[in-house]
Amino acid sequence: MSGCGLFLRTTAAARACRGLVVSTANRRLLRTSPPVRAFAKELFLGKIKKKEVFPFPEVSQDELNEINQFLGPVEKFFTEEVDSRKIDQEGKIPDETLEKLKSLGLFGLQVPEEYGGLGFSNTMYSRLGEIISMDGSITVTLAAHQAIGLKGIILAGTEEQKAKYLPKLASGEHIAAFCLTEPASGSDAASIRSRATLSEDKKHYILNGSKVWITNGGLANIFTVFAKTEVVDSDGSVKDKITAFIVERDFGGVTNGKPEDKLGIRGSNTCEVHFENTKIPVENILGEVGDGFKVAMNILNSGRFSMGSVVAGLLKRLIEMTAEYACTRKQFNKRLSEFGLIQEKFALMAQKAYVMESMTYLTAGMLDQPGFPDCSIEAAMVKVFSSEAAWQCVSEALQILGGLGYTRDYPYERILRDTRILLIFEGTNEILRMYIALTGLQHAGRILTTRIHELKQAKVSTVMDTVGRRLRDSLGRTVDLGLTGNHGVVHPSLADSANKFEENTYCFGRTVETLLLRFGKTIMEEQLVLKRVANILINLYGMTAVLSRASRSIRIGLRNHDHEVLLANTFCVEAYLQNLFSLSQLDKYAPENLDEQIKKVSQQILEKRAYICAHPLDRTC
């Protein structure tokens, strides 16, 4: 393998991989055990933990049979009985539809069986998400109920809390909502103003505050609510910290506003929820007092990955619908399917669906392992990739359909409206990119602390080691991270893509060290840098997923595995080239880096709060 030697054949890539001396200045239960391993974090060190991701996860035949038997009635219901157009127009899911969803068990998919749920694994939950995605409003309603609404009880609840609340939540008799966002705090969850004050008898907390954009807010009986509480620190000082509570509507003082009139997912119930002197028993604290922020992040981190299967299911149906149109519609005496620009759109949709599907089921498989790894970064990457791919691919589908895609007589414009929220839901993609990059950099920083300190102090042995690395890179260093060869885990038909993945990973690790040396702790403020770091990592994880999945498909002889190889290789080449450019941009002095210009343009606009260029028809005299 040519390693960074190939990488260094272009000027931009050479800059990206410069030396580091830049300056001296058995039951299917939802597993809730503590995380013990991580895959994505090791990529920041230029390492690939093969055992975490190769071979691609598999489910047992019994589990596969079970989920397939369950899918049939659900798919039949969505196909024959769900009127998505009516739901969208009326802005409400009919009561009879909700009752049918409850009877199918869809409100308790991941609730453990001993509490009345189905106890689906993450993999089975993802598979069902492909079917539920047939209606965006229903998808959001169910996800808000169990992916975030009741998830805190599963993850952090006591046995008493689980026994009290989960059975009715699993059956759908009670519906759950997640109450975090407030009028003055969106992505900045730590700045919430709702307050819970301990009563004099210390038996209740009195909750006051308002929450906004609460899905299921007008339907819910049970709310997971986050509020400021006074906490006595170890030094005796009193501080405000966030605490999570399980709040019943029946506690009193709980009201909600009218449903919001939204762009998309119009049938889901989204409204403000108000708490006025709501008495919460101390037994309803979720987790520990003052640990609410951690509880909130664990809830959100645990559910994001499933967006990938939802979007993949949507895109696969969209491909079928638009392919039928493209193969029958004629223009200029040729079918649309014969035009290269139309073919490009189908290739894009298929590739995006394949990558997000692979990322989702790889992540779900890791989470389903005993002592599951820390997959918070992986889940965030799936969410970012799939939400952006959804918006891009649905837009391309409308382009294929022309005017048909723009009219309300067909479902396409509704699908476009429904998908826009995905880039905002469960953490905006901007915030998640910061999370992805900073979490990984923090991991790398802890491990590289000594080396970076020695480089800053110009320790001779460390500097010479760095110079030696730089020299070997410039001469064409061989990068072999064990993916190919006699003992490799990637099929030979994917070897070139595996080599590209190894090269990118190695050079990413080198670049991370450079960034930590250059910025230190101030890297937290460098959002344009962090965005590129996150984008590289998302590509690397996508490459990982498709290489693992396609290798498995070849090995076991799945139908159309040659098509998978084609999709995997195409994505890996594109991701590799994107990564080269991003790596070059991370060099402060590279011509590809326009950070200062971007900041200057933005500053000038925001100072005037307007577009400041003169009109092209203006004159000076």
Swiss-Prot record:
Designated name of the protein: Complex I assembly factor ACAD9, mitochondrial
Originating species: Homo sapiens (Human)
Cofactors, names only: FAD
Effect of E413K: In MC1DN20; uncertain significance
InterPro entries xref list: ACAD9/ACADV-like_C, Acyl-CoA_DH_CS, Acyl-CoA_Oxase/DH_mid-dom, Acyl-CoA_Oxase/DH_mid-dom_sf, AcylCo_DH-like_C, AcylCo_DH/oxidase_C, AcylCoA_DH/ox_N, AcylCoA_DH/ox_N_sf
Function: As part of the MCIA complex, primarily participates in the assembly of the mitochondrial complex I and therefore plays a role in oxidative phosphorylation. This moonlighting protein also has a dehydrogenase activity toward a broad range of substrates with greater specificity for long-chain unsaturated acyl-CoAs. However, in vivo, it does not seem to play a primary role in fatty acid oxidation. In addition, the function in complex I assembly is independent of the dehydrogenase activity of the protein.
EC number(s) stated in the UniProt entry for this protein: 1.3.8.-
Single annotated GO MF: long-chain fatty acyl-CoA dehydrogenase activity
GO terms for biological process, alphabetical: long-chain fatty acid metabolic process; medium-chain fatty acid metabolic process; mitochondrial respiratory chain complex I assembly
Disease cited in the entry: Mitochondrial complex I deficiency, nuclear type 20: An autosomal recessive metabolic disorder associated with mitochondrial complex I deficiency, resulting in multisystemic and variable manifestations. Clinical features include infantile onset of acute metabolic acidosis, Reye-like episodes (brain edema and vomiting that may rapidly progress to seizures, coma and death), exercise intolerance, hypertrophic cardiomyopathy, liver failure, muscle weakness, and neurologic dysfunction.
Tissue expression per record: Ubiquitously expressed in most normal human tissues and cancer cell lines with high level of expression in heart, skeletal muscles, brain, kidney and liver. In the cerebellum uniquely expressed in the granular layer (at protein level).
Modification type N6-acetyllysine: residues: K41, K521
Family stated for the protein in its record: Belongs to the acyl-CoA dehydrogenase family.
Location of this chain's protein in the cell: Mitochondrion inner membrane
Phosphothreonine modified-residue sites: T478
Membrane topology: Peripheral membrane protein
Effect of E426Q: Loss of long-chain-acyl-CoA dehydrogenase activity. Does not affect mitochondrial complex I assembly
